[in-house]
Amino acid sequence: MYQLNQNQTVNTPQKYRPRLALTVGDPGGIGAEVILKALADLEIGHNYDLTVVSNKNLLQETYKQLSSMENLLPLADPNLLKIIDVTVDRETARQINLGTGNAASGAASFAYMDYAIAQTLAGNFDGIVTGPIAKSAWKAAGYNYPGQTELLAQKSGVERFGMLFVARSPYTGWTLRALLATTHIPLRQVADTLTPQLLTQKLDLLVECLEKDFGITSGRIAIAGLNPHSGEQGQLGTEELDWLIPWLESERQKRPHFQLDGPIPPDTMWVKPGQAWYGNAIVQHPADAYLALYHDQGLIPVKLMAFDRAVNTSIGLPFVRTSPDHGTAFDIAGQGIADATSMKEAISLAAELVCQRLHLEK
């Protein structure tokens, strides 16, 4: 049995304790482990009103298994947590195995999400922090969503939404914010999917988020080009000349409070953020936010800088949703070595965004 670190201090509780639902994600992955590790942190456990949406037996078995290991970080005791016990039928439950995803684990993780979304839309939670799911397991269970973000958008009835990745540097305190213009689509479809209308929609969402969630009413946004060297005057691709540069000129006229830089060659756009992450953010003058045009263009640099602490934030929803920026990690499930830093960051950021939206003191 592992005890909480008695040297930890607890801040005075906030005037308002954000009500957050924590979904455990795929029961075959590390979701239960990182949640129990995160909730053992007194800062998190005492400052926020947290409810875990999961099969209770999964949390108890995870706690029992991991507690028998030596040199393990503290774990929250499930018997002391607020848990909403969401179960699947016995036959499905018997098919769930630690370390792998299948139709059964997909059905379970979908049930956790479905419940949390319904209760949040009903006003019983202020936001959701989602554990990692396996898209292949969802598909095997008959749920054909590209990811959790798309399910959240559909259930919320919104058509405008985006994936914003947020990370605070432990070295300088600077905050990285990177929005993806396109998300879970094949690379060969990116150029045809990108349009001026789509980028205007994403830029609208980004500006609204900066103003509403981060209190940034003026600043600088960097926009990546699509092609190497941003096309190099049409020699390496013509999208920049054909429509991306004219689109940016039009957007600059409509948004005088924000400096829109771009299209910046994708490889060099991330130099200043990298320097600001590890060095002096004031000297480097990084942008307040970055708009990447496709998934890996944004997430490779984000994960290089902040793999253990980046947070996926769904913007455009009627409530706050965050998620740790890592997957199910089936290969290390049950070994006690999963890093809970990103889950802690996801919980803390969700609480901050809830308070910001409610105009309450943190």
Swiss-Prot record:
Keyword terms, alphabetized: Cytoplasm, Metal-binding, NAD, NADP, Oxidoreductase, Pyridoxine biosynthesis
Chief location of this protein within or outside the cell: cytoplasm
Localization, UniProt: Cytoplasm
Pfam families documented for this protein: PdxA
Classification via InterPro entries: PdxA (IPR037510), PdxA_fam (IPR005255)
MF-aspect GO terms: 4-hydroxythreonine-4-phosphate dehydrogenase activity; metal ion binding; NAD binding
Residues reported in the UniProt entry to bind substrate: 149, 303, 312, 321
Residues spanning the signal sequence: none
Cofactor: a divalent metal cation
Top-level lineage group: Bacteria
GO BP annotation list: pyridoxal phosphate biosynthetic process; pyridoxine biosynthetic process
Residues engaged in binding a divalent metal cation: 184, 229, 295
Swiss-Prot/TrEMBL catalytic activity: 4-(phosphooxy)-L-threonine + NAD(+) = 3-amino-2-oxopropyl phosphate + CO2 + NADH
Cofactor binding annotation: Binds 1 divalent metal cation per subunit.
Chain segments annotated as transmembrane: none
GO cellular component: cytoplasm
EC number: 1.1.1.262
Subunit structure: Homodimer.
UniProt family annotation: Belongs to the PdxA family.
Function: Catalyzes the NAD(P)-dependent oxidation of 4-(phosphooxy)-L-threonine (HTP) into 2-amino-3-oxo-4-(phosphooxy)butyric acid which spontaneously decarboxylates to form 3-amino-2-oxopropyl phosphate (AHAP).
Name the record gives this protein: 4-hydroxythreonine-4-phosphate dehydrogenase
